[in-house]
Amino acid sequence: MALKKFNPVTPSTRQLVIVDRSGLYKGKPVKGLTEGLTKSGGRNNYGRITARFIGGGHKRSYRIIDFKRRKFDVVGTVERIEYDPNRTAFIALIKYDDGELSYIIAPQRLAAGDKIVAGEAVDVKPGNAMPLASMPVGTIVHNIELKPGKGGQVARSAGGYAQLVGRDQGMAILRLNSGEQRVVHGSCMATVGAVSNPDHGNINDGKAGRTVWRGKRPHNRGVTMNPVDHPHGGGEGRTSGGRHPVSPWGKPTKGKKTRSNKATDKFILRSRHQRKS
């Protein structure tokens, strides 16, 4: 879908760039595939803020998405493509031949009326799902499982994808968007194609209010605070903070490596931090 720009009839529409969603379904989601969604406002069960700058925003209902795609060899028809406020990608309503309804993440080039199917060995076309062991090398995939049966966890946001670049001893080698190369078990499911809404990264909200509608509150810099609130606070007039950037709790930030070693590190063949050759 294309981007929409506006005539500058107000200051906020001057910079405003949004995704044209005229081709999406305009009604409400399927009630049986939705759940209530309670806002946390960034608070935990003690009522204390654990994630700053979160709160407000438009009320949402959660759409239950099928990330597992384990309904094998039952053909489904795409009823419509819908907007989902809980994610950057669009979602597709699928009606299977046995009458069951389901939501999946909509890949690019999937339209109402298309047929999709999941199985051990199915056609390589957008929306079809199969184990990585069954796919030809070079296939573009999304919604990739890291553990068989757990459901897709990788490449689920707008425009995301990975490429199957090889196989080795029952494992599939994937190249992710970040440049990381990773091995995943060949029995893990993945869906063919790249995720819909690739223009999401070109959106410009145009005004602070549109960000607030999404549930994000104003993000204050440490240098504008008082010393009691942040290590960068205080000083006469505007200051640069006077030290290397730290979090409100004094931990180094902006580039400091914080990732701890994990048992799954052995599945990373090439780090996303290695220089691109």
From Swiss-Prot:
Chain spans, region Disordered: 199-277
Q: Provide this UniProt record's keywords sorted from A to Z.
A: Ribonucleoprotein, Ribosomal protein, RNA-binding, rRNA-binding
Instruction: Please give the InterPro entries that the UniProt record associates with this protein.
Output: NA-bd_OB-fold, Rib_uL2_dom2, Ribosomal_uL2, Ribosomal_uL2_bac/org-type, Ribosomal_uL2_C, Ribosomal_uL2_CS, Ribosomal_uL2_dom3, Ribosomal_uL2_RNA-bd_dom
GO MF terms held by the record: rRNA binding; structural constituent of ribosome; transferase activity
For this record, the Gene Ontology CC terms, alphabetical, are: large ribosomal subunit
What is the protein's known function? One of the primary rRNA binding proteins. Required for association of the 30S and 50S subunits to form the 70S ribosome, for tRNA binding and peptide bond formation. It has been suggested to have peptidyltransferase activity; this is somewhat controversial. Makes several contacts with the 16S rRNA in the 70S ribosome.
Sequence similarity: Belongs to the universal ribosomal protein uL2 family.
Quaternary structure and partners: Part of the 50S ribosomal subunit. Forms a bridge to the 30S subunit in the 70S ribosome.
Protein name, please?
Large ribosomal subunit protein uL2
